[in-house]
Amino acid sequence: MSRKLKLKRVIARLDVKGPNIVKGVQMEGLRVLGDPEEFAEYYYNQGADEIIFSDIVASLYGRNSLLEVVSKTAKNIFIPLTVGGGIRSLKDINDVLRAGADKISLNSAAIKNPQLIDDAVKEFGSSTITIAIEVNLLDKKYEILYNNGRELAHIDLEKWIIECQERGAGEILLTAIHRDGTGQGFDIKLIDQVNKIVKVPLIVQGGAGSTKDIEKIISYKVDGIVLSSALHYTKIAQKDDTYKDTSSEGNKEFIKNKKTFLNFKNLDIKMIKQIVDS
């Protein structure tokens, strides 16, 4: 049975390390950008349909430090809040939901222990469980990674998606690491490949940098688009038009190759919503 698409969702993703939002390129060369609660409230006021918080070092260090951020944010925004990173057990899920999250995102823990998907769905419901799948293009092949893109999972992409669906996952969050933070557009080939097998809502991330990218993706069968760099740097530029990108910070190798973090064309949520809703 083919899935029925609802109205597209425009989702802001905030990668958190300690008390700060950070962002890099292809999950490397991280920069501190600001306060997660302030950014989340800003995107909420702009009309975001959902916020994703991801603790990008939680899985690596075996911790979950987002509870306070989630609790404070949930008091001021009234749209779905999804939380990922460091969630390894039903207790972790319960703690995050009690803090104010509406959904949780599993990646590393699900790869290491797929039974957690079944248990989480049984305990909290399918609509609460999102499976995050991070994919990189390595030697012309799409490979799944985990621990925020640090380790190869050695799992076939299509088989993993099918397994997650069969275990009851309510949604797939597909991130193209090789497009992350580049502003070079979504990986349409990857999305096409996944669309052939996915039966649950699919939200995609990685590469949005212009209105043309948004116009192109809405013609494909995706339920939502997730943006981070494109929104963050537009927000910073609007707040301080003296902000400049330099090769003295962040991923120097990426910038040296004549690409920059600011390869974005003044994208904000209000503008994106107008395109999506037109």
Regions found by a protein language model. Name each.
Residues 9-14, 23, 51-53, 81-85, ...:
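Hydrophobic faces of well-ordered beta-strands that scaffold small-molecule active sites
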Residues 6-9, 22, 75-83, 126-130, ...:
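Short beta-strand/loop segments at the ligand-binding rim of alpha/beta enzyme cores
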Residues 66-126:
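Glycine/small-residue-rich loop that forms an oxyanion/phosphate-binding "nest" at active or ligand-binding sites
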Residues 117-124, 215-278:
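C-terminal helical cap(s) of enzyme catalytic domains, especially alpha/beta-barrels
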Residues 16-18, 22-23, 101-179:
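Conserved anion-binding
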Residues 50-69, 108, 173-184:
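Glycine-rich, proline-tolerant flexible connector loops at the mouths of alpha/beta enzymes
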Residues 15, 43, 51, 83, ...:
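Conserved, mostly hydrophobic/aromatic
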Residues 77, 81-104, 189-227:
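Catalytic cores of alpha/beta
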